[in-house]
């Protein structure tokens, strides 16, 4: 019995650090029926692949460990957006409230340190006054940390909340002890506990604000989705909500208006700005029968379209979904941070205890020892580790989408930086994929025979012959016993005679001589044209030559890759001479050209290079490229290709420009560099900060501030990718 596998995304609330996301991920993966689950701290989302369970059970499992979960679908998106705004407003209010109460305590402390002992300063140094100001900060504003710490300890997965709760509580408790039960010390630390909470809350608020900017690419794409459409019904034009548009509706789109949804032009011509989908700045000319896509802009002509796709099935919706999935995925390099985050908080708790005991034993000043210990607790930051990789991936995939490069996940984004070999399919990748008949050699009737045979073919060369036949007025004849021979040609019976159309290799297998056409065929192939022969069971009757224009940017793109040290190969089912001619024109070495390759053999060449230690990227656009795309380290599909190719590939180039391959590698390298910088900063910050705190070089307030802003530095570094021009 077939298993019904589902994939759902949930928005997770209540996470504060990498330990939270790791705990939720572990809990989801332990649920019966769950095949895999990943939780992303930066996007605050969980992606769950499951069979025998329900979304309600999954949500309940998250709630049971102290977090919130909401199914991320169309029905809940508005609610999720509203709850996020409410949460941010509440956090902003708490931050302002906390700052108002903390500021007098801080100013009084600074004034006292500067030698001021006036009545106002003395008033704010009264134990009861400080307690009244610090109490709401500690237990109202800081309640979020206590709540988080409770759930973390309950599930035996201590997180940042535990560190903050213990650290600030220790400072607060010491202040109460000194203020109301004085022995030998009257020092109060209410300003320290309050300031730590205020600074950490400020850091969290800025972190949430910065994190929202990492998703700007998604927001920009979502803004392309129109709210209304002009529809023709019963001969009258009316405005309706986009949700009311149905397949086969006729929509009217005026110059300057956005296309509401995908459809085919049935009246009018225009040029459409597709830059938001493809990154291509030049408007694309469109005429009747051409497809247009939702979110694109009609620049000059009035057009009518017949709707073909709506809602989540439109190209724009699928692109948004692909980018969201990519931003929620994990790169292999993140495993380092995940492993460290899992043991980070217990280690910090242990170091804080060691600091307390050793400092107290050496100095005999247990209050000083406690302050050193508090500094260790509040400076340690697992958040920076948790955000280092996902924030860079979010921004990197967003930059890619803006440039027409759709990267499906963190693994592909990281893997592209390591590519040192690229295999290019010829037809539709190096060439335009729109072959045309250039030469017909043989008696006139071969056009009709070719035309009849190729009518049933799906091959691009076959379609070129059919288009030529229609253009010259060829007549189709009834055909029986039609057979497609992958990589070789086609055959069928017409008027009782069995014919074959295809390659010379197939003719040789049939023991047919083509000496009569040998010289002309050689000349055509050396010019880079593909020659197809027509034969019956006795002799070769003639041949047709087909040429496909090389893409304008092909030579430049290949040169760019070679300058990067990437070996470029070409694979094609075409004959050796035609393949070498094309390869020479675009600058591919002759020994890097694989010709006369059957569709099922393309994957073999990928495997061969991989066995030689190469990191291989495969670029293709057809159904027969799918196995090779799947096997490659990074499969790259051209946006003009088949759905199967794009579904199999790790990356889709929406504009079909070969120069986008180089952009993809540059973007991948830049993103990986940011990830490494982020991880380095997070490691160094904790490696240096914790010893400094333990030895008393940082007081708790400075330690808390450093902790708060360490995450911000990681986010800002990731966001700097937005300013990078990828070439």
UniProtKB/Swiss-Prot annotation:
pH-related activity info reads: Optimum pH is 6.25.
Q: Which residues bind Mg(2+)?
A: 621, 625
- Entry's PROSITE patterns? ATPASE_E1_E2 (PS00154), HMA_1 (PS01047), HMA_2 (PS50846)
Q: Where is the HMA domain?
A: 6-70
Q: What does this protein do?
A: Probably involved in copper import under copper limiting conditions.
Q: What do we know about what induces or represses this protein's expression?
A: By copper and silver.
What Pfam families does the record point to?
E1-E2_ATPase (PF00122), HMA (PF00403), Hydrolase (PF00702)
What family does the Swiss-Prot or TrEMBL record give for this protein? Belongs to the cation transport ATPase (P-type) (TC 3.A.3) family. Type IB subfamily.
Question: CDD domains recorded for this chain?
Answer: HMA, P-type_ATPase_Cu-like
Cell compartments where the protein resides: Cell membrane
Tell me what topology the record assigns in the membrane: Multi-pass membrane protein
Species in which this protein is naturally found: Enterococcus hirae (strain ATCC 9790 / DSM 20160 / JCM 8729 / LMG 6399 / NBRC 3181 / NCIMB 6459 / NCDO 1258 / NCTC 12367 / WDCM 00089 / R)
List the GO molecular function terms.
ATP binding; ATP hydrolysis activity; copper ion binding; P-type divalent copper transporter activity; P-type monovalent copper transporter activity
Q: How is its activity regulated?
A: Inhibited by vanadate.
**Assembly information from the UniProt record:** Monomer. Interacts with the copper chaperone CopZ.
Q: Which InterPro entries does its entry note? A: ATPase_P-typ_cyto_dom_N, ATPase_P-typ_P_site, ATPase_P-typ_TM_dom_sf, ATPase_P-typ_transduc_dom_A_sf, HAD-like_sf, HAD_sf, Heavy-metal-associated_CS, HMA_dom
Q: Which residues cross the membrane?
A: 95-115, 120-137, 162-181, 188-203, 342-362, 376-396, 679-698, 701-721
Q: Which GO terms describe its cellular component?
A: plasma membrane
Q: What is this protein called?
A: Probable copper-importing P-type ATPase A
**Ranges in the topological domain labelled Cytoplasmic:** 1-94, 138-161, 204-341, 397-678, 722-727
Q: Which residues lie on this side of the membrane: Extracellular?
A: 116-119, 182-187, 363-375, 699-700
| Active site: residue positions | 425 (4-aspartylphosphate intermediate)
Question: Which residues does the record give as Cu(+) binding sites?
Answer: 17, 20
Q: Which reaction(s) does its UniProt entry say it catalyses?
A: Cu(+)(in) + ATP + H2O = Cu(+)(out) + ADP + phosphate + H(+)
Report the EC code(s) recorded for this entry: 7.2.2.8
């Amino acid at each position: 019995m077939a298993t019904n596998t589902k994939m759902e995304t949930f928005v997770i609330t209540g996470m504060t650090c990498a330990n939270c996301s790791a705990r939720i991920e572990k809990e989801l993966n332990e649920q019966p029926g769950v095949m895999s689950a990943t939780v992303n701290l930066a996007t605050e989302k969980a992606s769950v692949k499951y069979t025998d369970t329900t979304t309600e059970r999954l949500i309940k499992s998250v709630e049971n460990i102290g977090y919130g979960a909401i199914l991320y679908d169309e029905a809940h998106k508005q609610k999720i957006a509203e709850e996020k705004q409410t949460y941010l407003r509440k956090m902003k209010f708490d931050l302002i409230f906390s700052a108002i109460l903390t500021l007098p305590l801080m100013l009084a402390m600074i004034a006292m340190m500067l030698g001021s002992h006036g009545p106002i300063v003395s008033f704010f140094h009264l134990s009861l006054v400080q307690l009244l100001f610090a109490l709401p900060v500690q237990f109202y504003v800081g309640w979020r940390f206590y709540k988080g710490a409770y759930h973390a300890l309950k599930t035996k997965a201590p997180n940042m909340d535990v560190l903050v709760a213990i650290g600030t509580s220790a400072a607060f408790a010491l202040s109460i002890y000194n203020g109301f039960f004085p022995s030998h010390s009257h020092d109060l630390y209410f300003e320290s506990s309050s300031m730590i909470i205020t600074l950490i809350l400020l850091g969290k608020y800025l972190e949430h604000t910065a994190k929202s900017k990492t998703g700007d690419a998604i927001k920009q794409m979502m803004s392309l989705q129109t709210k209304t459409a002009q529809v023709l019904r019963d001969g009258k034009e009316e405005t309706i909500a986009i949700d009311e548009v149905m397949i086969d509706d006729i929509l009217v789109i005026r110059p300057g208006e956005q296309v509401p949804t995908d459809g085919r032009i049935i009246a009018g011509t225009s040029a459409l700005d597709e830059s938001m989908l493809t990154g291509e700045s030049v408007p694309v000319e469109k005429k009747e029968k051409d497809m247009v896509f939702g979110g694109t802009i009609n620049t000059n002509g009035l057009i009518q379209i017949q709707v073909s796709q709506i809602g989540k099935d439109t190209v724009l919706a699928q692109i948004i979904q692909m980018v969201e999935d990519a931003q929620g995925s994990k790169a292999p390099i993140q495993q380092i941070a995940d492993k460290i985050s899992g043991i980070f908080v217990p280690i910090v708790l242990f170091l804080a205890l060691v600091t307390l005991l050793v400092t107290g034993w050496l100095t005999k000043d247990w209050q000083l020892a406690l302050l050193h210990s508090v500094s260790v607790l509040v400076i340690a930051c697992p958040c920076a580790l948790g955000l280092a990789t996902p924030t860079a991936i979010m921004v990197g995939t967003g930059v890619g989408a803006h440039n027409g490069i759709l990267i499906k996940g963190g693994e592909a984004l990281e893997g592209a930086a390591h590519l040192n070999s690229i295999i290019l399919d010829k037809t539709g990748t190096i060439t335009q994929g729109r072959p045309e008949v250039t030469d017909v050699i043989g008696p006139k009737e071969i056009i009709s025979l070719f035309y009849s045979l190729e009518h049933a073919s799906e091959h691009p060369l076959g379609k070129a012959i059919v288009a030529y036949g229609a253009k010259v007025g060829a007549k189709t004849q009834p055909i029986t016993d039609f057979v497609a021979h992958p990589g070789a040609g086609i055959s069928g019976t017409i008027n009782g005679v069995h014919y074959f159309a295809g390659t010379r290799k197939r003719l040789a297998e049939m023991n047919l001589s083509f000496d009569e056409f040998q010289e002309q065929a050689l000349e055509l192939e050396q010019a880079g044209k593909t020659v197809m022969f027509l034969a019956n069971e006795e002799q070769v009757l003639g041949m047709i030559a087909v040429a496909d224009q090389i893409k304008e940017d092909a030579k430049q793109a290949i040169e760019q890759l070679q300058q990067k040290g990437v070996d470029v190969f070409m694979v094609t089912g075409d004959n050796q001479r035609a393949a070498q001619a094309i390869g020479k024109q675009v600058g591919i070495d002759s020994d890097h050209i694989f010709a006369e390759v059957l569709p099922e053999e393309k994957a073999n060449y990928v495997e061969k290079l991989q066995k030689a230690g190469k990191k291989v990227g495969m670029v293709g656009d057809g159904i027969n490229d799918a196995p090779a795309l799947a096997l490659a380290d990074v499969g790259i599909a051209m946006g003009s290709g088949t759905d199967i190719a794009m579904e199999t590939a790790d990356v889709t180039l929406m504009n079909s420009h070969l120069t986008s391959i180089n952009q993809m590698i540059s973007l991948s390298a830049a993103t990986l560099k940011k990830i490494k910088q982020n991880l380095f900063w997070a490691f160094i910050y904790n490696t240096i900060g914790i010893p400094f705190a333990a030895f008393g070089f940082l007081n708790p307030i400075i330690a808390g501030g450093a902790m708060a802003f360490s995450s911000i530095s990681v986010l800002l570094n990731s966001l700097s990718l937005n300013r990078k021009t990828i070439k």
